[in-house]
């Protein structure tokens, strides 16, 4: 499959923290909360050191701009799960620093636009949220579907925060 990157990106700083080309086609999107109102430039700097051992495909700053840190063809190191990251486009979103880790409206609206863009470029017509870890991880998306997953299903974290569940 030929992978493309989002044209919504206004800032790029590629991180060395990735596993190279994916071993699974894209059929998941995993949004995250940054736990801070980090700009796309700050996120790029956070993901730059090899010692960080973390990255995401995209980030959305508090102003709604989109940054790219790992191209979609490559697996980011974002959700504490190799299996999830191999098939998910991962998106860090600027958020409040305390639970429920709310996103500003411009961040949320940009997240929606980015999800739609990812779906369209990958030939998907349905974005699914099942809300249940077992159901989601056991679900085999149809060729026209992408399913949402969350970081808290793979690590002892609140991410993406309870605001996303409201």
Give the location of each predicted region.
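Short C-terminal domain-edge/linker segments immediately following a structured domain
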Residues: 60-64, 88-90, 120-125
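N-terminal catalytic cores of peptidoglycan-degrading enzymes
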Residues: 1-85
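Structural preference for beta-strand elements that scaffold enzyme active sites
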Residues: 28, 88-90, 147-149
């Amino acid at each position: 499959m030929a992978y493309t990157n989002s044209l919504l990106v206004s800032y790029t700083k590629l991180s060395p923290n990735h596993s190279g080309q994916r071993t699974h086609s894209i059929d998941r999107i995993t949004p995250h909360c940054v736990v801070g109102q980090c700009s796309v430039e700050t996120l790029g700097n956070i993901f730059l050191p090899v010692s960080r051992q973390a990255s995401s495909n995209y980030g959305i700053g508090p102003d709604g701009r989109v940054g790219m840190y790992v191209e979609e063809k490559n697996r980011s190191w974002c959700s504490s799960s190799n299996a999830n990251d191999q098939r998910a486009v991962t998106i860090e979103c600027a958020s409040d620093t305390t639970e429920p880790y709310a996103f500003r409206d411009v961040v949320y609206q940009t997240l929606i636009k980015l999800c739609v863009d990812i779906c369209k470029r990958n030939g998907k017509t349905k974005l699914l949220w099942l809300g249940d870890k077992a159901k989601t991880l056991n679900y085999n998306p149809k060729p026209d579907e992408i399913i949402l997953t969350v970081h808290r299903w793979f690590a002892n974290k609140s991410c993406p925060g309870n605001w996303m569940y409201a």
